[in-house]
Structure formats: structure tokens, C-alpha cells
Amino acid sequence: MSSFENLRIVDNFYQTSLFFPMPTVIISTLCEDGSTTLGPYSLIQPYYVAGKDYYAMLLSCRNSSNTAQNILRNGKCAINFIDDNPKTFKEAVKLSWPGDKPSDKMPKCKFKLEDGITQEETGELRPKVLTDAIEVIECTWVRELDGADKDKFYIF
């Protein structure tokens, strides 16, 4: 007899029932009005780590999410790695509801934000980064990477 228990697969099964040793990150992106919005993710991993003129990360997210739509629209995001403090996770969960508008969730957000190094160095408008992040990767969407220039974004 197996020592494992058979679990019923439910919505968000990977968050509620499975263990993947993945970091939890907060992705910061720019809204249409230039303000920063945040979304928590754990489905992120290195994509290209060597042998290229650049490095790449792979983010799995719904194409209709605010995060995906903002990245497709302006090609910028920051990957903010957060600590594993329960208070930090509680704050991350508040940002995770699909359909929440940035204008509704961001005023209640307790994460402190600051300009990232790229914006300071270039003056280019970029998503703000979490002040208390363990580390931050500031990213630019390479639209042509592996045919990504064929991706579409939708305005709902």
C-alpha cells in the first residue's frame, strides 16, 4: 500500500496541494498611466543562462492578467524576490486576485517602492522595485525571442 495520499485536484492546485521548490516573487509592471502595479508569482525560472548575448527569465502567467498585459504593452518589468516571512506572504496574497484593478489594490499595498537602478541610470520610466526585496532583476521584454513578437494582447 502506498504511503502517499490521493488528493483531489482543485483550482490553484499547485499552490494548495503540490510542493515545488520555487521562489515567490513580486512582478512590478507599468500601467497605462505610468504607475507601478504589483503581482505575486512563483512560476518563474531561468530560460537562457549562458551562450547568448543576454540572459532571459521565463514567467508563466495568464495572458489576460494585468502583469502579462502590461509587459506585452510596454515591455518592462522587475522581478522582486521576497523573503519568506509570513507577514510578507500575507501582503503578497492581497495582490493576487485575478481581475483586481491596480487602482483598487495598489492604494492598500504595504510594500515600499523605489526607483530601480535602470531608471536612475537612464532616466527611462521603469516599474518601481520593492525597497525590501532580497534581490531584483529589472527586465526588458525581447519581443522577437522565440517568436514572441507574434503574441497578442487584449484590452478588456
Regions found by a protein language model. Give the residues of each.
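Active-site-proximal mixed secondary-structure blocks
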Residues: M1-T37, Q45-F156
